[in-house]
Amino acid sequence: MVPRVIGMIHLAALPGSPQYGGDFAAVVDAAVSDAKVLETAGFEGLMIENFGDVPFYADDVPKATVAAMTHAIGRVGDAVSLPLGVNVLRNDAAAALAVAASTGAAFIRVNVLSGVMYTDQGPIIGRAAEIARMRAALAPNVAVMADVFVKHAAPPPGITIEQAAEELAGRALADAVIVSGTSTGRPPTLPLLRK
């Protein structure tokens, strides 16, 4: 089951990231604190992502990032009783699935699951076939939530949002489709949601 009201936990810069402050315990403690606040506020689930790791790798983060996220998400899971989600930015769905499998997280977010999007990391190509097979083998109970026309990106010409959403649900096997605005903090418009 994918929660409908999900609180977001943005991890501060992790070890190996350019803006890492050198205190990993503080990063984890902040995530745990945020999780407790969001649980008390009534959120149905929590999504945890490495938001502080700018600039992002396109689709293959360092192993240190995977290890740090696994530890942080494990600690958050020990502190709250909500279903957890994992997003490894910018688009490392394989790492997100591995972290989810090892921490017991319920779902992952994939910014580009199918097709291609043009981002500040360059073109990112979805790997739905690889992720579907990895999920079947490693974590069949982990839900995949996928963005359609993800924020901070542009689709190729000629592709409509309706087409992309149908492909995500029908052919890429996404369990849920996420519609975001054009950038973080800018929600999608009502006409876009109606499409």
Where would I find each of the regions flagged by the language model?
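Extreme N-terminal starter segment of soluble prokaryotic enzymes
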Residues: M1-V5
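Alpha/beta enzyme core
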Residues: I6, L11-D60, A67-P83, N91-K195
